């Protein structure tokens, strides 16, 4: 299996990819290095495909990978309560239905100027 090491041990690399994947699902666009963007593209595409399947097994597989972070909060004045949506809920309720008619290619990578300081090639990865 071909993958990039990204200058980290395997556990650090897996944790970083999980974090970046979750951040992309929450924010729908992030700025990172080109190598990281190309790596998280694989995992995000898999998560959206699981979201499109939508069954219990797919939800559990996605829950095992995506971090349990709050994607959005809203306040309901009528009931005087806050409601929050996690990244997993957003994946299955908002993102996956958006790509119901699309077979892959859910992300776009746009190259930007090199990072100041170490001139690392930077990119913006976003959901199409």
From Swiss-Prot:
<dbReference type="GO" id="GO:0022625">
    <property type="term" value="C:cytosolic large ribosomal subunit"/>
</dbReference>
<dbReference type="InterPro" id="IPR036373">
    <property type="entry name" value="Ribosomal_bL17_sf"/>
</dbReference>
<dbReference type="InterPro" id="IPR000456">
    <property type="entry name" value="Ribosomal_bL17"/>
</dbReference>
<comment type="similarity">
    <text>Belongs to the bacterial ribosomal protein bL17 family.</text>
</comment>
<dbReference type="InterPro" id="IPR047859">
    <property type="entry name" value="Ribosomal_bL17_CS"/>
</dbReference>
<dbReference type="Pfam" id="PF01196">
    <property type="entry name" value="Ribosomal_L17"/>
</dbReference>
<comment type="subunit">
    <text>Part of the 50S ribosomal subunit. Contacts protein L32.</text>
</comment>
<keyword id="KW-0687">Ribonucleoprotein</keyword>
<protein>
    <recommendedName>
        <fullName>Large ribosomal subunit protein bL17</fullName>
    </recommendedName>
</protein>
<dbReference type="GO" id="GO:0006412">
    <property type="term" value="P:translation"/>
</dbReference>
<dbReference type="GO" id="GO:0003735">
    <property type="term" value="F:structural constituent of ribosome"/>
</dbReference>
<keyword id="KW-0689">Ribosomal protein</keyword>
């Amino acid at each position: 299996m071909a993958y990039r090491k990204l200058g980290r041990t395997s556990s650090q690399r897996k944790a970083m990819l999980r974090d970046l994947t979750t951040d992309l699902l929450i924010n729908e666009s992030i700025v990172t290095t080109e190598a990281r963007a190309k790596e998280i593209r694989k995992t995000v595409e898999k998560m959206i495909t699981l979201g499109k399947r939508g069954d219990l097994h797919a939800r559990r597989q996605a829950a095992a990978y995506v971090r349990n972070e709050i994607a959005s909060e809203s306040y309901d004045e009528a009931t005087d309560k806050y409601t929050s949506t996690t990244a997993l809920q957003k994946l299955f309720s908002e993102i996956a239905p958006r790509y119901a008619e699309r077979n892959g290619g859910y992300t776009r990578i746009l190259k930007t100027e090199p990072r100041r300081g170490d001139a690392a090639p930077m990119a913006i990865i976003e959901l199409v």
